[in-house]
């Protein structure tokens, strides 16, 4: 019995290996993506590359077409992308896992892997808005917390 306790104590003293995959919270996602370019492949084979501008714009292409009125924001444990004007908008939210330098984006709704990506520092692919006005209607990754007063909306705060 004493030998078993000594072995157990010795095993507990061993360093715990790091987890292979870390699930990122919204703040960690923001720190990784903001001001950087996220590029990768969807599980269906399509390629994407988007510069995550600190003002909330997602510049580049989402695999199928150049982005226009594409925006990004973080939530408690997700990154969400909004593509197109309000009248014809698509929204995609993902949880993000990090395995060394590979980011795994899972659909927030069903947890299926949507894409694998890497993050490049800055905007090395020179993604831009091509001189077009961009409309993110307050969907800004660094938007302030919701006010306690119901008189001031998030949209009005983001417009400041």
Regions found by a protein language model. Give the residues of each.
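Lipid interaction determinants
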Residues: 16-69, 81-160
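Short, conserved beta-turn/loop elements at beta-strand boundaries and strand-helix junctions
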Residues: 75-79
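Bacterial N-terminal signal peptides
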Residues: 4-13
